[in-house]
């Protein structure tokens, strides 16, 4: 796996799923391929994106700044500086300085990532802030190691939280989660169906599923009534894809 592929993988792992994630993935691909060279426009676009947390925006801004060539005097962006300030906690800043000194001695991506993983997310963000604000310099490879270590920590905590929700025994949370998943699956089906004639059937199934979820929420149904809803939808989607000559078995 190339370095940039690895960076893209880690960064995208902390972006919530949805159309915006696909858009960010495309921007990252363009930046890494050298196709997007207007850093200012890129940062303005990033700043106005909804849904993303300030820290995720800060990390993306840091990655764009590391990758896109820019004039020496280009202003640093406030939204990135604020996100990478470690919440203004002096402990984070102290640890960030210690980490920075260690990173100065590293020359490889994996070496830097290994060193960084033993620090807290706040210290890692502060260390990125030091580099972003030009208070310290490390090689691009080492900076990418720092980015990936931060993303790994964030993704770990997101995964723990997600696992807690999926394994919860609370029937109301499970019921709502199944309805949300069914609804987003239906939305994805509608987007994939496009405008072909065969698509009418898939659109019909998706639309009925969304109406059903709305009705279930309106009248308040038994928590077990949503069981299998998403799987039924996915079976319909796969049947539709088969007819269209597309074989994709990996949706479940």
Curated annotation (Swiss-Prot):
Keyword Nucleus found: no
Sorted UniProt keywords: Host nucleus, Membrane, RNA-binding, Viral matrix protein, Virion
Region (Membrane-binding): 1-164
GO term, biological process aspect, one: viral budding from plasma membrane
Location in the cell: Virion membrane; Host nucleus
Pfam families: Flu_M1 (PF00598), Flu_M1_C (PF08289)
InterPro entries registered for this protein in UniProt: Flu_matrix_M1, Flu_matrix_M1_C, Flu_matrix_M1_N, Flu_matrix_M1_N_sub1, Flu_matrix_M1_N_sub2, INFV_M1
Record-level Gene Ontology MF annotations: RNA binding; structural constituent of virion
Ranges spanned by the short sequence motif Nuclear localization signal, renumbered to the chain: 101-105
Primary location: virion
An example Gene Ontology CC term for this record: virion membrane
Spans annotated as RNP-binding: 165-252
Membrane topology: Peripheral membrane protein
The family this protein is said to belong to: Belongs to the influenza viruses Matrix protein M1 family.
Subunit annotation: Homodimer and homomultimer. Interacts with NEP. Binds ribonucleocapsid by both interacting with genomic RNA and NP protein. May interact with HA and NA. Cannot bind NP without genomic RNA.
The protein's role, per its UniProt record: Plays critical roles in virus replication, from virus entry and uncoating to assembly and budding of the virus particle. M1 binding to ribonucleocapsids (RNPs) in nucleus seems to inhibit viral transcription. Interaction of viral NEP with M1-RNP is thought to promote nuclear export of the complex, which is targeted to the virion assembly site at the apical plasma membrane in polarized epithelial cells. Interactions with NA and HA may bring M1, a non-raft-associated protein, into lipid rafts. Forms a continuous shell on the inner side of the lipid bilayer in virion, where it binds the RNP.
Note, other: Most abundant protein in virion. When expressed alone can form virus-like particles in transfected cells.
This protein's name: Matrix protein 1
Biological source species: Influenza A virus (strain A/Equine/Tennessee/5/1986 H3N8)
Record lineage: Viruses, Riboviria, Orthornavirae, Negarnaviricota, Polyploviricotina
Primary gene name: M
